[in-house]
Amino acid sequence: GLELSTPLRVGLGYDSHRFESDRPLILGGITIPDHPGLAGHSDGDAITHALIDAILGAASLGNVGTHFPPTEEKWKDADSTELLSNSVAVIDREGWMVVNVDVTVICESPQISLFAEEMKERLSGVLQVPVERISIKGKTNEGLGWIGESKGLAVHAVALLESR
C-alpha cells in the first residue's frame, strides 16, 4: 500500500461568482469579449481561484481566502494570475510542484471550448507545467438553478502535486 510519505497529493478547488455587467469577464487569465464579468474582490477569475484552492489544498497550505483575504484592500481588483503565481511559489517553497490540473467550468455562456486553448496557454506559464497537462472544459447546467438562469458560473478544479 501507499505510505504516508507518498510523493503525490491531490487537491480539489471550487469557486463561483455571479455575473456583474460593469466588469470585464476574466477567466483562466484571459479576457472574454462581449460578456458580463464576475463579481469579486479581485478580478473575479473563478478558474484561477479554484486552481489556487486545489493547489494550496493539495499541499495542506490553506486556500485563496487565507492567503489573499477579501478584507485586504491590496487584493482589490488584483490580477488573479498573479495570485496563482504566488500560490505556486508557496507550494514550491514547501517542496511541491504541480503535475497536472483539470478544470470544469459550469455555465450557460460563454462557450468555454472557444477559449480553452488560449486559457491553457496563459495558465501554462503561471503553473509552470506544459499545456498538455492542463485540461479546461465547459459544461452547462441544462437551464437549472442560478447557473442555468445565467446569473453566474461555477468552477471545479483538481490539481495533482508531486514532491520534489
Predicted regions and their residues:
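RNase III-family endoribonuclease catalytic core
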Residues: L2-E117, V126-L127
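C-terminal binding/interaction regions
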Residues: Q111-S113, K120-E121, V126-G148, G152-R164
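Generic detector of short, aliphatic-rich beta-strand segments that form the cores of beta-sheets
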Residues: G1-L2, A157
